[in-house]
Amino acid sequence: MKEVCYPFYVLKLLGVEQVVLTNACGGINRDFAPGTLMLITDFINMMGTNPLIGPNDERFGPRFPDMTEPYNLELQELAKHTAEEMGIDYKEGTYLGFMGPCYETAAEIRAFAGMGADAVGMSTVPETMVCNYMGMKVLAISCITNMATGT
């Protein structure tokens, strides 16, 4: 987990203030289809861990960072406007991060759907948490590459 997030600490030290994250993931929402681009508006952390566990380094952020708005609204509006100008279809949704390397079971996918998840994958959530912790603005876009088991 720390290795995945390390580059974002370096980016912060280099002065980067905003990041765009992308991923390929499984669709849970039945209104989505493979090839759908989903603007991530929120996340659910089901990874069983958090990259901020451990001693806090105050140079980067507070001990208990706020995750109320993990994805920057201004960047989302810019992405929406740009997609509309270019005629690119997209959906908005909640991304659920799940620890791999196994894919989810059909029962897990049903549970995740009940929790409000639109898509599921094995990345993006730790990076989002670390970037928010450091005060970086985050935009994240998923490409639905397949429908999750049981959908």
Describe the function of each predicted region.
Residues 57-96:
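Metal-dependent peptidase/peptidase-like ectodomains
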Residues 12-15, 113, 132:
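Non-catalytic positions within long, well-ordered alpha-helices that form the structural scaffold/packing
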